[in-house]
């Protein structure tokens, strides 16, 4: 029996798809990329209108390319659109965000009854769904979900409605899970969650968790998928200062560079607070890569607000940014606000920020030409290998030896945007090494 999983959206979904894959394997399925499988799972996203469109398109693709499959739709889109999806009788099983581990139970039930199953828990107060992995298929960087849900209710965001309230994985389970992954050869682990920095288990907060994780023997890199600026407290700064296991990259959502818009968004900081904390981070790690998310065209965003955001992004010197045009989401306060921004104006502002993004990326990448950086190599094509540095630069090298899954020291020779091109220091000719090590 074969199964295929289509995954959309965030790193949390990537982790949860791996858990589903494990469950399928344990029950006799070969998880494959080949279509026309016996079981087909679509793990959906609904964070933006575009995510909704991609989810619908992927569901239709999955149905068409897997005509004999038991089709299962799970995740954030099915959590809020389960009634709409239930009208499509080609979808056999519909699960939400809090019961993805019920796939096997539901497959067996469907085989018996041949009746569509809709199992979506609409209560916001959930318990943390038990999930644990000891490998990550076809990857050399493993994601570990430590937390689910969000209590912030930013006025633009549907996620508190799809993921429910904050709940967290047991402290000991997180440590055991990462220890198992490291024993199985993973050198880098990425902590992920819906609101990762809100982690709390008994008396252990997020910084306590980091303190224990960095002690795990054999773990070379610990990456945080995303963290709010308000959670970067003195305890976190102390860990950043003391541990070289924490990578030189941190993703801190900004959302807007206008204090007026931040207030309308119900964000918990202003630009001054944000800037001051960034300065503290750079005092500890001068070359750290700081990336962010911004939303363009939030209701009420006028030209001055956009210019303020543009200037603030330029001033902070992000090494990269994700740019999203604002889209109305059901249940959110922003969807009901006056002064919705014209779509053409949004598109023009997005274009301007994408140009700024490219300039910022090039500026940051160029700082490392001639420098030696450690790279975890993840993919290969013949003698060409691609991986990422601690500060999340994408690097390409050529090598005759197999370096996939290994961390190698590389000298960066040039930029072929958006990739850095370098050479393994171990393969540099002797006469050149003296220059490199000066």
Mark where each language-model region is.
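Residue-level signal for inorganic ion chemistry
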Residues: 41, 76, 103, 191, ...
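Short, conserved catalytic or interaction motifs in soluble domains
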Residues: 148, 159-164, 229, 267, ...
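Proteins enriched for Cys/Gly/acidic motifs involved in redox and nucleic-acid/cofactor modification
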Residues: 1-192, 197, 202, 235, ...
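Terminal RNA-binding accessory module
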Residues: 336-438
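Conserved SAM/AdoMet-binding glycine-rich loop
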Residues: 71-72, 80-81, 85, 183-303, ...
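Short flexible coil/turn linkers enriched for glycine and charged/polar residues
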Residues: 137-140, 150-152, 246, 256, ...
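Short glycine-enriched, charge-decorated loop/helix-capping segments at active-site entrances
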Residues: 46-47, 163-164, 263-269, 336-341
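Conserved loop-to-beta-strand segment in the C-terminal subdomain of adenylate-forming
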Residues: 248, 329-335, 422
């Amino acid at each position: 029996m074969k199964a295929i999983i289509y995954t959309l959206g965030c790193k949390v979904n990537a982790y949860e798809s791996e858990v589903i894959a494990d469950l399928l394997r344990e029950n006799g399925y070969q998880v494959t990329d080949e279509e026309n499988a016996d079981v087909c799972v679509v793990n959906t996203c609904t964070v933006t209108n575009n995510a909704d469109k991609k989810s619908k398109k992927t569901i239709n693709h999955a149905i068409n390319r897997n005509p004999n499959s038991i089709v299962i739709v799970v995740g954030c889109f099915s959590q809020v659109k389960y009634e709409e999806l239930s009208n499509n009788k080609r979808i056999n099983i519909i699960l939400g965000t809090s019961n993805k581990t019920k796939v096997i139970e539901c497959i067996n039930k469907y085989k018996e009854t041949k009746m569509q199953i809709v199992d979506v828990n609409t209560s916001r107060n959930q318990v943390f769904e038990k999930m644990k992995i000891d490998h990550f298929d076809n990857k050399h960087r493993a994601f570990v979900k430590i937390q689910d849900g969000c209590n912030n209710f930013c006025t633009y965001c549907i996620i508190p409605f799809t993921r429910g309230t904050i709940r967290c994985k047991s402290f000991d389970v997180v440590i055991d899970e990462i220890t198992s992954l490291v024993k199985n050869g993973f050198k880098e682990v990425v902590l992920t969650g819906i609101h990762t920095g809100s982690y709390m288990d008994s008396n252990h907060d997020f910084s306590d968790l980091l303190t224990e994780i960095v002690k795990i023997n054999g773990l070379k890199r610990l990456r945080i998928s995303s963290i709010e600026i308000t959670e970067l407290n003195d305890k976190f700064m102390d860990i950043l200062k003391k541990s070289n296991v924490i990578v030189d990259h941190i993703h801190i959502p900004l959302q807007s560079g206008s204090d007026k818009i931040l207030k309308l968004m119900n964000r918990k900081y202003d630009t001054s607070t944000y800037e001051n904390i960034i300065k503290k981070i750079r005092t500890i790690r001068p070359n750290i890569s700081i990336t962010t998310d911004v939303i363009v065209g939030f209701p009420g965003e006028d030209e001055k607000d956009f210019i303020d955001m543009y200037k603030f992004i330029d001033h902070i010197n992000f090494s990269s940014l994700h740019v999203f045009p604002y889209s109305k989401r059901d249940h959110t306060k922003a969807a009901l606000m006056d002064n919705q921004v014209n779509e053409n104006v949004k598109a023009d502002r997005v274009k301007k920020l994408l140009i700024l993004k490219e300039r910022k990326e090039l500026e940051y990448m160029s700082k490392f030409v001639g420098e030696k950086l450690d790279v975890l190599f993840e993919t290969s094509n013949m003698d060409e290998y691609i991986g990422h540095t601690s500060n999340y630069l994408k690097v390409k090298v050529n090598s005759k030896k197999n370096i996939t899954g290994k961390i190698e020291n590389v000298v960066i020779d040039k930029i072929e945007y958006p990739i850095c091109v370098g050479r393994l220091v171990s393969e540099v000719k002797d006469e050149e090494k003296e220059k490199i090590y000066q």
